């Protein structure tokens, strides 16, 4: 009975999310229904013994309050600090300076499709400092896209490479990485170094080759003629105010160092390098913002304007709270509902009885997240919703939580780039003047290679 009830709620919630209902609201409502059903049918409890308010209907809201309190003081503040810093870097043009500086060595290469693949690899490493897939794609469309097309690459091939440059959310300051590290029980830097880097080392060269072959073959199939153009002749559609600012911003070259300050601080003062000095993500982001603010004052000589621009940092924090942290909390609330009905225990027991085991459950969850990421156009929403189930499943199946959460997180970001409705695809295709549906035909093969390699590498290296 409990399995049937849970299945109906889960299917209903999935249908609503696919119909573009607000994911946070759907997860909160579905989680509340599961908890209510669990209490009415005496399948489980909502709060631990001694924590109840005395009325189970009140316990549901007390659980939400507890989740908000716990998440906002730890994981939530980390995510908000990262979001605020990223917005401030965009505001002062530091992200643009970093991209403009790092693409210069690529000018020395003459083969159009090698330059295109190298641009994709460069974008993957830029993603360590610039965590927004859409933001990074926008910057590369303004700076690198005209160069690629001028070398002879077709507009759609250049856009496909740029739109997939952050197909692995593998930065230690990425919101998904921070969350995955907490689920796995590791410091974000240790998690990044121990688990994400080995996967990235397997994925990056293979996807670069896949891009080279896919785009070259499909350009030839479509009758594209490789010929050099003047970069000034290559048009880029700049429609939004943010895109205009990114295109017109010409910050000092030294600003290229500002986005990497927090990353450098996190890595240097970590157990990997200098374990005697403590550094956390929030401190690194605040220090990076303070240094950037000083640099901005010397650039503008306007103290009032410099102080005023810091509002962007706070706005960025608020945006992360509204868009990311609420999904994390809603997903955790939904997971509590699933657990309270006993469905997770039943699923694990069924898997063990049939010999499916932890590996089979991991593959099923990976597949669900990949499909949801494509249909929803978001990697974070399905990952944050399902990742909260990992600790319970891992504990009862005897595998490390990192073995399950690692491919779930990375698959979400790769599958996202196959969706025609995801932000990065819409931004890149709009600036290139092509259809997002045509674009995902070019991103599908390289991203499929990425997804397969993530799973295989995870099983080979950590299985």
Predicted regions and their residues:
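Long, contiguous bundles of hydrophobic transmembrane helices that form the permeation core
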Residues: 3-14, 27-34, 38-46, 193-312, ...
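Re-entrant/interfacial helical elements at transmembrane boundaries that shape
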Residues: 98-100, 134-147, 175-184, 347, ...
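Interfacial loop-to-helix junctions that mark the boundaries of transmembrane helices
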Residues: 1, 48-53, 61-74, 188-197, ...
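Membrane-interfacial loop-to-helix junctions in multi-pass transporters
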Residues: 1-3, 69-76, 104-118, 151-156, ...
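Membrane-core helix-loop-helix motifs of multi-pass transport proteins
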Residues: 141, 145-232, 246-256, 400, ...
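Short helix-coil transition sites and intra-membrane helix breaks within transmembrane domains
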Residues: 22, 72-76, 86-97, 127-139, ...
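Core transmembrane alpha-helical segments of multi-pass membrane transporters/permeases
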Residues: 50-96, 282-343
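Hydrophobic alpha-helical transmembrane segments of multi-pass integral membrane proteins
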Residues: 78-81, 108-143, 328-333, 354-392, ...
């Amino acid at each position: 009975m409990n399995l049937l009830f849970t299945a109906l709620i889960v299917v209903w919630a999935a249908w609503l999310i696919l119909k573009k209902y607000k994911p946070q609201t759907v997860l909160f409502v579905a989680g509340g229904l599961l908890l209510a059903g669990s209490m009415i049918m005496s399948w489980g409890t909502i709060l631990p013994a001694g924590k109840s308010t005395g009325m189970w209907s009140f316990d549901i809201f007390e659980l939400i309050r507890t989740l908000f309190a716990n998440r906002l003081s730890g994981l939530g503040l980390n995510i908000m600090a990262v979001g605020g810093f990223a917005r401030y870097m965009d505001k002062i043009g530091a992200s643009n300076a970093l991209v403009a500086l790092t693409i210069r060595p690529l000018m020395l290469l003459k083969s159009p499709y090698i330059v295109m693949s190298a641009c994709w690899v460069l974008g993957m490493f830029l993603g360590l400092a610039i965590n927004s897939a859409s933001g990074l794609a926008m910057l590369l469309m303004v700076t690198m896209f005209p160069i690629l097309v001028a070398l002879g690459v077709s507009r759609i091939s250049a856009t496909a490479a740029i739109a997939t440059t952050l197909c692995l959310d593998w930065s230690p300051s990425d919101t998904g990485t921070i969350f995955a590290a907490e689920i796995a029980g590791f410091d974000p830097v240790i998690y990044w170094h121990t688990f994400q880097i080995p996967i990235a080392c397997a994925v990056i060269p293979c996807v670069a080759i896949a891009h080279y072959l896919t785009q070259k073959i499909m350009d030839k199939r479509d009758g594209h003629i490789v010929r050099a153009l003047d970069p000034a002749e290559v048009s880029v559609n700049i429609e939004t105010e943010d895109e205009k600012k990114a295109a017109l911003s010409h910050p000092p070259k030294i600003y290229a160092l500002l986005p990497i300050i927090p990353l450098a601080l996190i890595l240097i003062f970590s157990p990997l390098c200098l374990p005697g000095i403590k550094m956390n993500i929030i401190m690194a982001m605040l220090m990076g913002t303070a240094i950037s603010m000083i640099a901005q004052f010397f650039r503008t000589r306007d103290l009032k304007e410099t102080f005023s621009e810091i509002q962007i940092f706070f706005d960025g924090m608020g945006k992360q709270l509204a868009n990311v942290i609420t999904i994390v909390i809603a997903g955790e609330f939904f997971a509590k509902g699933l657990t309270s009905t006993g469905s997770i225990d039943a699923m694990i027991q069924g898997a063990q009885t049939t010999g499916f085991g932890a590996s089979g459950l991991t593959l099923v969850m990976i597949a669900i997240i990949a499909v949801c990421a494509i249909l929803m156009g978001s990697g974070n929403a399905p990952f944050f919703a399902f990742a909260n189930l990992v600790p319970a499943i891992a504990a009862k199946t005897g595998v490390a939580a990192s073995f399950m959460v690692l491919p779930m997180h990375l698959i979400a970001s790769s599958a996202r780039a196959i969706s025609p409705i995801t932000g990065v695809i819409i931004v890149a295709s709009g600036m290139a003047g092509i259809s997002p549906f045509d674009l995902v035909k070019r991103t599908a093969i390289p991203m499929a290679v990425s997804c397969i390699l993530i799973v295989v590498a995870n099983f080979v290296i950590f299985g």
